[in-house]
């Protein structure tokens, strides 16, 4: 459900925990005037930065800094907002937070009433929730605030910035408007069956549906790119012991993350690292070596192989690593076939043949899609990076990509499915207009869930609870 008591005035430290040059305490609510005078010692001119002391209950300065007052509705939350920009010490900011709560509860000298009744510390995400409730942001923009804060790459940050500026929402709203127009035509045909004019034929309903579906496909493609920037791709390195999985992880990461020795079975557990390729995060997992029929040499290796298979089952892609120097060995080749047969269906597998620098000249020819590289020298690594991006569906230089989440993709895909059924109904000679109208309504509602127009309260509460306090 929605966060509770969203009419109460709220206060929180808006900057990250820890020491810094500047820290901010933010207050949002109605009627902040008496609180402002108590803490700042004077009224503040709206939307101007005022330098001066922040006062305790005895009128002594706690600190000096900037105070800014934003009257409603011209603020982040759409309510009246006060921001106190002080020095960024954790103890100092807690003092200012406590002072705001204390001053709010004390009676105003003129009215005798509390200066700001009900002021409380904000819940996580409550400032942004109020911005959503007061129509300052739609839901996709509100989520983009959190994604911008959490962005781990420049590309993700820029895409989140586009979503915050409304790039995603505008495209969704355009689709919704076109669906509304078509729904009106269908409803008119249902409501006035005696009219000689066929509203659907006159308005080219089938053509409209096709054009809406085409536009939706374009938005979905951009959303998939944005989701990739946010979520990344989980890639598992798999193969027999001592084929160079840890060396490849180190080469891709550009750092010595995993222990590398000539001894087979050095890696006994998963080692994970997030790397970036052209701004796309890849979560690469190095796993313990696999053996034919899980023929472990000891209990530790058996557990390690179990975890390796578990990681493979959760992967978006598997780099199945082979050792070129051992190709042709009967025991090695038999184990390769056993492992390959046990790889789960539906997982993308890249066949990568390592140790090209040490392989004998004239080594066996590889399959057309297989890659040949050397984790030690770096030969073939750029080709592997490009293949991983292709596998992820990333298109270099994509324009207008906005950040997107899994729920956005699900909503867009649901919309597409309803449009497919709507087009099938519209193409029938005996089209059931009531069924067509229902499919259009469901498509319309699915789109509305992205921006928050038709979103259950439970989902809203879950979204905003994931924000940091003060945002």
UniProtKB/Swiss-Prot annotation:
The EC number(s) this enzyme carries: 3.6.-.-
Residues noted as binding Mg(2+) in the record, renumbered to the chain: 246, 267
Note accompanying the cofactor annotation: Binds 1 potassium ion per subunit.
Biological processes, Gene Ontology terms: tRNA methylation; tRNA wobble uridine modification
UniProt-annotated binding residues for K(+): 242, 261, 263, 266
Function description: Exhibits a very high intrinsic GTPase hydrolysis rate. Involved in the addition of a carboxymethylaminomethyl (cmnm) group at the wobble position (U34) of certain tRNAs, forming tRNA-cmnm(5)s(2)U34.
Binding site for (6S)-5-formyl-5,6,7,8-tetrahydrofolate: 26, 83, 136, 471
InterPro entries, sorted: G_TrmE, GTP-bd, GTP-bd_TrmE_N, GTPase_MnmE, MnmE_dom2, MnmE_helical, P-loop_NTPase, Small_GTP-bd
One annotated GO molecular function: metal ion binding
Residues engaged in binding GTP: 242-247, 261-267, 286-289, 354-357, 374-376
Domain (TrmE-type G): residue spans on this chain: 232-393
Presence of keyword Metal-binding: yes
Family: Belongs to the TRAFAC class TrmE-Era-EngA-EngB-Septin-like GTPase superfamily. TrmE GTPase family.
Protein's name in the database: tRNA modification GTPase MnmE
The protein's assembly and partners: Homodimer. Heterotetramer of two MnmE and two MnmG subunits.
Gene Ontology CC annotations of this record: cytosol
Organism of this sequence: Methylibium petroleiphilum (strain ATCC BAA-1232 / LMG 22953 / PM1)
Cofactor: K(+)
Gene: mnmE
């Amino acid at each position: 459900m929605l966060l509770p008591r969203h009419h109460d005035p709220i206060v929180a430290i808006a900057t990250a925990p820890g020491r810094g040059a500047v820290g901010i305490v933010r207050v949002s609510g109605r009627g902040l005037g008496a609180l402002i005078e108590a803490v700042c010692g004077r009224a503040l001119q709206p939307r101007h930065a005022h330098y001066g002391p922040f006062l305790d209950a005895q009128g002594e300065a706690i600190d000096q800094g900037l105070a800014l007052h934003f009257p409603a509705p011209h603020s982040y939350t759409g309510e009246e907002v006060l921001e106190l920009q002080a020095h960024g010490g954790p103890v100092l900011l807690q003092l200012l937070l406590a002072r705001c709560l204390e001053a709010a509860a004390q009676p105003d000298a003129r009215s005798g009433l509390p200066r700001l009744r009900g002021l409380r510390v904000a819940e996580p995400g409550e400032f942004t929730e109020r911005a959503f409730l007061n129509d300052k942001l739609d839901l996709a923009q509100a989520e983009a605030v959190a994604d911008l804060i959490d962005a781990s790459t420049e590309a993700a940050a820029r895409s989140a910035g586009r979503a915050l500026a409304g790039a995603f929402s505008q495209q969704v709203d355009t689709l919704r408007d076109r669906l509304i127009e078509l729904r009106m035509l269908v409803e008119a045909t249902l409501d006035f069956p005696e009219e000689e004019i066929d509203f659907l034929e006159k308005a080219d309903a089938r053509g409209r549906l096709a054009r809406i579906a085409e536009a939706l496909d374009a938005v979905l493609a951009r959303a998939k790119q944005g989701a990739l920037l946010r979520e990344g791709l989980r890639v598992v390195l798999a193969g027999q012991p001592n084929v160079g999985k840890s060396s490849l992880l180190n080469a891709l990461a550009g750092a010595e993350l995993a222990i590398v020795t000539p001894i087979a079975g050095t890696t006994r557990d998963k080692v994970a690292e997030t790397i970036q390729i052209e701004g796309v995060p890849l979560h690469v997992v190095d796993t313990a070596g696999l053996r034919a029929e899980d023929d472990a040499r000891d209990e530790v290796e058996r557990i390690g192989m179990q975890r390796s298979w578990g990681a493979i089952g959760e992967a978006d892609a598997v780099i199945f690593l082979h050792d070129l120097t051992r190709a042709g060995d009967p025991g090695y080749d038999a184990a390769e076939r056993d492992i390959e047969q046990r790889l789960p269906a539906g997982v993308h597998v890249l066949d990568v043949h390592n140790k090209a620098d040490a392989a004998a000249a004239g080594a066996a020819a590889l399959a057309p899609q297989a890659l040949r590289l050397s984790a030690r020298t770096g030969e073939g690594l750029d080709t592997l990076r490009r293949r991983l991006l292709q596998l992820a569906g990333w298109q270099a230089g994509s324009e207008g990509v906005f950040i997107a989440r899994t729920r956005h993709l699900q909503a867009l895909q649901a919309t597409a499915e309803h449009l497919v059924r709507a087009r099938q109904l519209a193409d029938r000679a005996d089209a059931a207009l009531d069924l067509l109208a229902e499919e259009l309504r469901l498509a319309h509602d699915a789109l509305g869930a992205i921006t928050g127009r038709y979103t259950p309260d439970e989902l809203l509460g879950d979204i905003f609870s994931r924000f940091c306090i003060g945002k």
